[in-house]
């Protein structure tokens, strides 16, 4: 309203506050507002349950327990030490344990020479919340998708994506699609070339198998070492938390 005589910052604040109230259902009638409140409450409850299931599945579900040190071939010594400590803390002294977490899985997928073990750990990560047990998240995910759609429609949006993107730089699903269309072809071409290089290396090493998802990190690291003569382990000491903080504030 031009009669308010607001400066740029004040106008921005008013616009954002107004948008917040609209997105919270301020223009809905009492019946629709109650429905929105119920949807938000149920979504909040389901989200907490979903996260708890995922956490339990990660901590209490599958774990890779290794008893013979020869199965640790290729793993850095500090990573093996961490796995030994984890196994001991879980009641398995003298063994090594790996769980489907990023901090445990990615180094294992990168350095382990045991393809069958890489496959087991990778698949356990992908299957979290999808094992038809008390921690299964499939039905929760379906309910959450349905409720998000109901909320978006109630507030005048076609999809949940439209509702979420309105407050981002992208603003709309069409702009997101345009951006993805720009990067899809070159990204896909790059990925195919990397996969071809990895498959070629597999064949050179005498491997009689097709590159799979659990091989990607391992052969990507091998190719990096061959092309650039360095490994992530070599530069890791230079990026410790202490050194990074010193570099940032010195």
Residue ranges and their predicted role:
Residues 1:
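Aromatic-rich surface patch/π-platform used for binding flat ligands and interfaces
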Residues 9, 24, 28-31, 109, ...:
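Conserved aromatic-histidine-acidic binding/catalytic patches
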Residues 89-128, 216, 220:
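Active-site-adjacent "gating/activation" loops or surface patches in catalytic cores
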């Amino acid at each position: 309203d031009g009669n308010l005589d607001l400066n740029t910052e004040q106008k921005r604040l008013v616009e954002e506050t107004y948008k917040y109230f609209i997105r919270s259902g301020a223009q809905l009638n009492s019946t629709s507002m109650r429905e929105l409140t119920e949807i938000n409450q149920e979504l909040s409850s389901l989200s907490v349950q979903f996260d708890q299931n995922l956490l339990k599945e990660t901590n209490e579900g599958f774990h890779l327990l290794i008893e013979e040190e020869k199965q640790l071939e290729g793993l850095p010594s500090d990573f093996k030490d961490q796995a030994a400590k984890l196994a001991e803390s879980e009641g398995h002294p003298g063994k090594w344990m790996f769980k489907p977490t990023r901090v445990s899985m990615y180094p294992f997928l990168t350095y382990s020479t045991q393809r069958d073990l890489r496959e087991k750990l990778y698949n356990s990560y992908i299957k979290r919340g999808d094992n038809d047990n008390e921690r299964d998240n499939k039905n929760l995910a379906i309910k959450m998708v349905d409720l998000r759609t109901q909320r978006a429609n109630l507030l005048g949006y076609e999809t949940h994506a439209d509702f979420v993107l309105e407050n981002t730089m992208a603003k709309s699903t069409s702009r997101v699609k345009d951006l993805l269309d720009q990067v899809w072809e070159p990204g896909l071409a790059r990925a195919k070339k990397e996969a071809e290089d990895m498959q070629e290396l597999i064949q050179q090493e005498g491997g009689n198998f097709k590159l799979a998802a659990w091989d990607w990190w391992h052969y990507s690291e091998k190719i990096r070492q061959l092309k650039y003569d360095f490994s992530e382990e070599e530069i890791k000491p230079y990026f410790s938390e202490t050194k990074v903080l010193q570099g940032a504030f010195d």
